[in-house]
Design a protein with these regions (language model features):
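Hydrophobic transmembrane alpha-helices and their membrane-interface caps
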Residues: 24-31, 345-413, 871-958, 963-982, ...
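Helix-loop junctions and hydrophobic alpha-helical segments within the transmembrane domains
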Residues: 322, 329, 333, 408, ...
Length: 1019
């Protein structure tokens, strides 16, 4: 008993299968997790080390170099990039793509152990060594707290209260606060007063530094009981600090700290990072979601919790959403579900009109059940509903009906020939089940490189393959089981759907016209082939005019403005300038909100957002508009106005993008040892970019050289006075800004103690040599000019960038996002000119940016592509037990580029990475249709028919299933044409498949006749 006969006769089992698919599909759809975009693992960690007082060169040589050397010993490392600046080393470590998210924690632990083992050998002045391995955490809910009448301490207190409540919500991963300013105790010590009392500042500094150190005092056994010893004297109030006793040197009197110092409580004066939201100082609360949760449901819980806490919110504090991933996901998924429903409706309507009511209902029901079954498998394998998985379903829709169309078509033909329903169903399923399986596996295999790619782009797009795999395989199962069952229920024997003539179902005018055209093509077979080759050559030439793109801009109406002040600018000056720029942007029309992050980037609120490192001269504005159309209008206005309005900073305007994307579209990396040579080469590269009218935001990552003040230390004089270089440095630090010495523990809060001179005694550059410094030899203060032989002004490299342990200066640029130009076009124009530059020995130029990202993504695909195509060819050989016959349909695969090239040019769509995936998938669709036709030719030949007539009759009999399969796929793509992410892929598949239908129905028969030497029948 065949599977079709079994399905028809065992109606209870078939109905049970339908009920399981329907109920299970609906239930699974409701249970599926929801995301805006699929998760992909950011395989990066950051090592941050501080080395106060060290120059960028000293940081590079004494701190960055040994850290990089030790990290590089790990076998998992892909690349290491670092930034060495004054007193700070920032090292980004990227893992190889071979390692998945489950392996990363162990790798980070191993790296942490290596760095900890190295720490004792690092310079003594290295104060902190931090390893951030949650660099890829995404804070999908970002809240901004503002309040005109509240200071940072009060805002932070309320933020802490909210954090404690939000952390308890089911589905919340972690909650972090950013933008808060450290509260400090300022101890202002009068140097004049110390000199009068003959007190050494270092004595006070030492006391403050040691008084609150937590040190074990041991334990003692008392009557068999072990008691801990806890000496009192810990400073935990300002009063206790004021009453700290200092021993006077000359008089022997006990002097309290308040006798020589004024102690106040306040906010750090030089912040690391400041946030603004709509012009107000802000604190950010970032909430990340736990893995695998339904983001929309957790977002609703967060909203409900915040609403319940509204009553305890202090009056005057405002809380606003900066980013609400739950809402974004809900909107995105709803839009895609609507697109999916539209696509299903389009396919079913087409089937009803072209196949007849009953046939259309059968295939439509099978399509819906296949989609429901796909939801069940997605739920089982933890594939969430998001842009990629839903897009995959829409892409698959047209292909999902292919197998069912072939089966229904065969049943209809059998009925026209007088067979019973069960005979017709059994015959067609027996005849086509294995060719259809082979064709389905080939279609799935065409998408396999996406699923097997291990780079970030492959991980991002991977669910596309798995959803297509599930749905296409299910479409084969339902085609050979449920389709015969439903046909037996709904079709009538002796059905007249196909034609009025029962003896020949292909007497219709469409079939007759096609048959005549095919006979002409077979008669002039070499002219037909020559014409196709000419079209292919023309398409390849035309493809050079198609715009190239990696990933398109996001649908979210948000963009970024990066502002760079001249290097060396104090962050307080950057704050002042950022406030003016933020106010200017906020005055523009159609603004939803403007936020600013000064000193570094925001917390990562989306996977594709790359936070900037710490730079005092940097600020980023995040601008959200009312809709996407007005965003581009505003971008155009700001692009022309910002530079004219503000002369000090430079600006870079960036759009949010789908998928992983580089910081800049064009990156020319210049590697070599000498900074001066690197800068000279950078000037030449920048000159080339400046000559191209399409280049924007041209700069390099070493920034401008900065000035430094160099007191010339006389070591011999200083030694006689008992003064070291460290004494001079600490005294100057105290005189100009102050030093953090010690901590005061106030409950759970730890307040750093900042020791500095009163404002009236702080010196400026001109009076540097008059700074008073304590001489241990003289036991008194002396002016610094006794140990300094003048002061000079020098230049230094503020930032030393390295890549894989080599100094690397990167020239950065972007294309004009408001024009028709693309990054790939700009790269194609400037790359040959840059590579033609004379490069000194020991230096090289390599390329990053979008070029590298695209190349890496394509290499990830091409790694498995040869094996995939080999498997596809082997399957076609096994299906036909021949080597020559598969060549017939494989010849048509490269010809699909004809439709793709002219389709993209006609619609002015770019050839993006998604379009590239669409091009790969076309091969599977073309082969699938070709197999159906070639299998029919074999059947006709096996029945003893004349070869020439067998070719014509087979092609005519396959016109409807092949053209219907193509038509449903093409029309089902319509909702994706208007999607920013899938638009170019949709056009690629629609245009390519439309032309491929001609290839299948005309070129395959012609090539078969040529390869097998078949001539027209003499009759």
């Amino acid at each position: 008993m065949s599977i079709a006969e079994y399905s028809i006769k065992n109606k209870v089992i078939s109905w049970l299968f339908i009920v399981i698919l329907a109920i299970g599909g609906v239930t699974s759809f409701l249970e599926l997790g929801r995301l805006e975009d699929p998760a992909f693992t950011i395989k990066d960690a950051m090592v941050i080390a501080t080395y106060p007082g060290a120059t960028s060169k000293e940081v590079e040589e004494e701190l960055t170099y040994p850290l990089e050397k030790e990290i590089r010993k790990l076998p998992y490392i892909d690349k290491i990039t670092s930034t060495s600046s004054n007193g700070l080393s920032q090292i980004m470590v990227s893992m190889k793509m071979d390692y998945g998210p489950d392996e990363l924690p162990q790798i980070w632990d191993e790296m942490r152990r290596k760095i900890n083992d190295l720490q004792p050998s690092l310079p003594q002045g290295v104060q902190s060594l931090q390893i951030i391995d949650d660099f890829g955490d995404v804070y999908g809910v970002m809240l901004m707290l503002t309040g005109d009448d509240y200071n940072y301490v009060e805002l932070k207190r309320y933020a802490d209260q909210l954090t404690r409540e939000l952390e308890l919500i089911d589905g919340v991963g972690k909650v972090d606060i950013a933008g808060d300013q450290q509260e400090q105790l300022f101890v202002e010590i009068s140097l004049d007063r110390l000199a009068a009392l003959n007190l050494d500042m270092n004595v006070i500094s030492g006391l403050l530094n040691k008084q609150n150190n937590v040190v074990s005092a041991g334990e003692v056994m008392v009557n068999g009981e072990s008691l801990m010893i806890r000496p009192s004297g810990t400073l935990n109030t300002v009063d206790a600090l004021e009453n700290l006793i200092i021993h006077g040197r000359d008089t022997g009197n006990l002097i309290r700290l308040k006798d020589v110092a004024t102690i106040t409580r306040g906010i750090q004066e030089k912040p690391d990072n400041v946030l603004l939201f709509n012009g107000k100082k802000a604190i950010n609360i970032g909430v990340s979601f736990a893995s695998g949760v339904n983001v929309v449901e957790v977002g609703q819980r967060i909203e409900a919790e915040l609403a319940s806490l509204e009553s305890i919110k202090p009056a005057g504090i405002d809380m606003s959403y900066f980013y609400n991933q739950a809402q974004e996901v809900d909107d995105s998924v709803k839009a895609f579900v609507i697109s999916l429903a539209e696509a299903v409706a389009i396919v079913i309507i087409v089937l009803l009109f072209t196949m007849g009511l009953r046939s259309g209902v059968i295939i439509g029901l099978v399509l819906l059940l296949t989609v429901f079954g796909t939801f069940i498998l997605m739920n089982h394998y933890d594939i969430e509903l998001h842009r990629i998985s839903l897009g995959a379903l829409i892409i698959a829709l047209g292909m999902l009906v292919d197998n069912a169309i072939v089966v229904v078509e065969g049943i209809l033909v059998g009925l026209k020939k007088g067979r019973t329903k069960i005979q017709a169903a059994t015959d067609i399923v027996k005849q086509t089940q294995w060719p259809l399986l082979g064709a389905t596996v080939i279609a799935i295999t065409a998408f396999a490189p996406i699923g097997l790619s291990q780079d970030a782009t492959g991980e991002f797009m991977g669910s596309l393959f798995w959803v297509l795999c599930f749905s296409l395989f299910l479409s084969w199962i339902t085609a050979i089981t449920l389709t015969p069952f439903l046909a037996d229920l709904l079709l009538k024997e002796q059905d007249k759907t196909l034609a009025a003539d029962e003896e020949d179902p292909y007497k219709g005018w469409l079939f007759v016209a096609f048959g005549a055209s095919l006979k002409w093509a077979l008669r002039f077979r070499w002219l037909t082939v020559t014409g196709m080759v000419a079209l292919l050559v023309g398409a390849v030439v035309a493809f050079g005019n198609v715009k190239q793109q990696f990933f398109p801009p996001s649908n979210t109406p948000m963009f970024y403005v990066d502002m760079w002040m001249p290097e060396g600018t104090d962050i307080r000056e950057t704050m002042k300038q950022a406030g003016e720029v933020e106010s200017y942007i906020r005055q523009q029309a159609n603004i939803d909100f403007v936020s600013a992050s000064i000193g570094q980037g925001l917390q990562r609120f989306a996977l594709t957002y790359e936070p900037a490192k710490n730079y005092e001269a940097y600020a980023q504005f995040q601008v959200r508009t009312t809709d996407r159309d007005t965003m581009f209008v505003l971008l155009n206005e700001l692009d022309s106005r910002l530079a004219k309005t503000f002369d000090k900073p430079t600006f870079q305007l960036k759009l949010m993008e789908f998928g992983p994307s580089p910081a800049s579209k064009i990156e020319a990396r210049i590697t070599g040892p000498d900074p001066q040579v690197l800068r000279a080469l950078a000037v030449q590269v920048e000159d080339i970019l400046h000559t191209d009218p399409g280049a924007r935001n041209i700069r390099h990552d070493w920034r401008e050289r900065t000035k430094q003040i160099v007191p010339i230390f006389n070591e011999s004089k200083a030694r006689r006075l008992g003064i070291s270089k460290e004494d001079l440095s600490s005294t100057l630090q105290m005189s100009f800004g102050g030093s953090t010495l010690g901590l005061l523990r106030d409950g759970t809060h730890i307040l750093p103690i900042m020791v500095r001179l009163p404002e009236t005694e702080r010196v400026d550059f001109e009076s540097l040599q008059n700074v008073s410094i304590w001489s241990p030899s003289l036991q008194s203060y002396i002016p610094a000019d006794q140990i300094i032989d003048g002061v000079t002004l020098d230049w230094e490299e503020p930032l030393i960038q390295r890549r894989d342990r080599k100094r690397t200066l990167t020239v950065l640029a972007d294309h004009d996002v408001l024009s028709e130009d693309t990054a790939a076009s700009l790269f194609a124009r400037v790359q040959p000119k840059v590579m033609a530059l004379p490069i000194p020995h020991g230096y090289e130029i390599t390329w990053g940016g979008e070029y590298e990202s695209s190349k890496d993504a394509q290499e990830g695909l091409f790694g498995s592509l040869p094996m995939g195509y080999l498997l596809m060819f082997i399957i076609t050989m096994l299906l036909f037990n021949s080597f020559k016959k598969p060549l017939v349909i494989w010849f048509t695969v490269p010809l699909s580029i004809i439709g793709v090239a002219f389709g993209l040019l006609a619609t002015n769509m770019p050839f993006s990475f998604t379009a590239f995936l669409g091009l790969l998938s076309l091969s599977g669709m073309i082969l699938k249709n070709g197999i159906v036709l070639l299998d029919q030719i074999n059947l006709e030949l096996d029945s003893g028919k004349d070869p020439y007539l067998a070719i014509i009759d087979s092609a005519v009999s396959r016109v409807r299933p092949v053209s219907m399969a193509a038509l449903t796929t093409i029309l089902g793509m319509i909702p994706l044409v208007f999607d920013a992410f899938f638009g170019s892929m949709a056009i690629t598949i629609m245009a390519g498949l439309g032309f491929a239908t001609v290839l299948t129905l005309v070129v395959v028969p012609v090539m078969f006749a040529i390869l097998f030497g078949i001539k027209p029948a003499k009759s």
